[in-house]
C-alpha cells in the first residue's frame, strides 16, 4: 500500500470510528470562514459567500466545485456607522421576492457594538450588489444579545431573523414582508447558561414536521495561537421544535434555552472545530450540512479553514451526518 493510500484509509477509519463521514470533495477555492450557500434559479449555478474581503464570494457548477472566487459583495464596505464596517462577517443568503439578499454582520471581536446589514442583487453578478445598511437589528452593551450571525427564515408568509453570539446567545426577530428591516422586538430561542455562553451562528431549517435550529458551540477561532482544551473547540449542535418561534429541545428533551443541544458534528480524525454551518437542499443530493473546518494535516490558522459538506440523514427524526 502506498503512503498516500494509507493516509486516506487511516483518515476514513478514524472518521468512521467517531461515527462521522469525512467532508465531501471540494475543488478550487476552498478556504472559507462562515460559508453561506445558494443556487441561482436562472441557471443552477452555485454561489458561496464567506467572512473576509468585505464578504468574499465564489461560484461553481456544483457543491464540489471547482469554486472560483468572484470578488467582494461590498468592495467599499458597509454604510453602517460602526467599527468594523470595512471587515464584514458571517454572511447569510436568501432569495426574497425574486431578489437575492445577503445579510452581513458589522462588529469587532468581543464587542456588542454590532449590527446586521443587508445587500441585494437581482443576479448575484460581480458589482451588482446594492448596500441597504442596517436592518434595524443592532446591539450595544445595554442589550442582552450581540447582533451578529444573522440567518433569515421564512415560515408561511412571515420572515424571521435568527441571530446572536455569546451573551444571551440566540434571539429571533420578526421581519417586514420584504425582509429588509425588523418588524417587532426580539426574543430568546437558545441559551447556554453555563461558562462563557459559547453559542452562536444559528441556522434554521424545516424538514418534515420539525423546525431544526442548528448552531455552533464552543471556541471558533485562533487555534494556531491558542488551542482550546479538548472538547471546547467549535462543534455543530441542533435542537428542534414543531414551531419556528420557540420551545426548541434537544434529543434528550432538554430545552435549548437551558443549555440543550444535540451534537451533529464535532472534531474527528483530521477534521477539527467544524462550525459556521448552514443547511442547503441540493437538487441531486438532498439536504446538505455545510460548514468550515480545520484540516489538522494542513494548519490551524483561520485563513486555512476549509469548506466542508456532508449529506444529512433525517430518518431518525434528528440530523445525522
From Swiss-Prot:
Residues forming the catalytic site: 34 (proton acceptor), 200 (proton donor)
A biological-process GO annotation: arabinan catabolic process
Keywords on record: Carbohydrate metabolism, Glycosidase, Hydrolase, Polysaccharide degradation, Secreted, Signal, Xylan degradation
Domain of life: Eukaryota
Keyword Secreted listed: yes
Protein location: Secreted
Protein family per UniProt: Belongs to the glycosyl hydrolase 43 family.
Main location: secreted
Gene this protein is translated from: abnA
UniProt-listed Enzyme Commission number(s): 3.2.1.99
Uppermost EC category: hydrolase
Record-level Gene Ontology MF annotations: arabinan endo-1,5-alpha-L-arabinosidase activity
Name used for this protein in its record: Probable arabinan endo-1,5-alpha-L-arabinosidase A
SUPFAM superfamilies: Arabinanase/levansucrase/invertase
Described purpose of this protein according to its UniProt entry: Endo-1,5-alpha-L-arabinanase involved in degradation of pectin. Its preferred substrate is linear 1,5-alpha-L-arabinan.
Residues under site feature: Important for catalytic activity, responsible for pKa modulation of the active site Glu and correct orientation of both the proton donor and substrate: 149
Amino acid at each position: 500500500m502506498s503512503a498516500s493510500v494509507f493516509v486516506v484509509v487511516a483518515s476514513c477509519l478514524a472518521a468512521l470510528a467517531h461515527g462521522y463521514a469525512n467532508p465531501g470533495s471540494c475543488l478550487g477555492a476552498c478556504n472559507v470562514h462562515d460559508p453561506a450557500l445558494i443556487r441561482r434559479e436562472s441557471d443552477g449555478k452555485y454561489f458561496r459567500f464567506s467572512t473576509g474581503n468585505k464578504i468574499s464570494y465564489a461560484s461553481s457548477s456544483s457543491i464540489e466545485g471547482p469554486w472560483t472566487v468572484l470578488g467582494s459583495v461590498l468592495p467599499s464596505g458597509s454604510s453602517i456607522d460602526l467599527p468594523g464596517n470595512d471587515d464584514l462577517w458571517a454572511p447569510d443568503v436568501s432569495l426574497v421576492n425574486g431578489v437575492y439578499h445577503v445579510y452581513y454582520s458589522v462588529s469587532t471581536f468581543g464587542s456588542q457594538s454590532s449590527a446586521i446589514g443587508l445587500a441585494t442583487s437581482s443576479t448575484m453578478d460581480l458589482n451588482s450588489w446594492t448596500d441597504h445598511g442596517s436592518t434595524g437589528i443592532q446591539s450595544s452593551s445595554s442589550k442582552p444579545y450581540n447582533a451578529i450571525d444573522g440567518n433569515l427564515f421564512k415560515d408561511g408568509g412571515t420572515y424571521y431573523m435568527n441571530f446572536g453570539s455569546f451573551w444571551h446567545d440566540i434571539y429571533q426577530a420578526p421581519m417586514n414582508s420584504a425582509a429588509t428591516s425588523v418588524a417587532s422586538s426580539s426574543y430568546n430561542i437558545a441559551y447556554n447558561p453555563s461558562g462563557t455562553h459559547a453559542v452562536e451562528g444559528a441556522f434554521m431549517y424545516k424538514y418534515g414536521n420539525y423546525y431544526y435550529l442548528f448552531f455552533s458551540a464552543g471556541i471558533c477561532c485562533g487555534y494556531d495561537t491558542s488551542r482550546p482544551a479538548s472538547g471546547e473547540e467549535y462543534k455543530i449542535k441542533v435542537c428542534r421544535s414543531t414551531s419556528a418561534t420557540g420551545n426548541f429541545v434537544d434529543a434528550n428533551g432538554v430545552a435549548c434555552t437551558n443549555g440543550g443541544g444535540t451534537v451533529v458534528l464535532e472534531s474527528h480524525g483530521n477534521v477539527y472545530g467544524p462550525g459556521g454551518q448552514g443547511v442547503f437542499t441540493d437538487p441531486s443530493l438532498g439536504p446538505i450540512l455545510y460548514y468550515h473546518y480545520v484540516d489538522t494535516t494542513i494548519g490551524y490558522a483561520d485563513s486555512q479553514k476549509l469548506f466542508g459538506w456532508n449529506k444529512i440523514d433525517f430518518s431518525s427524526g434528528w440530523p445525522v451526518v
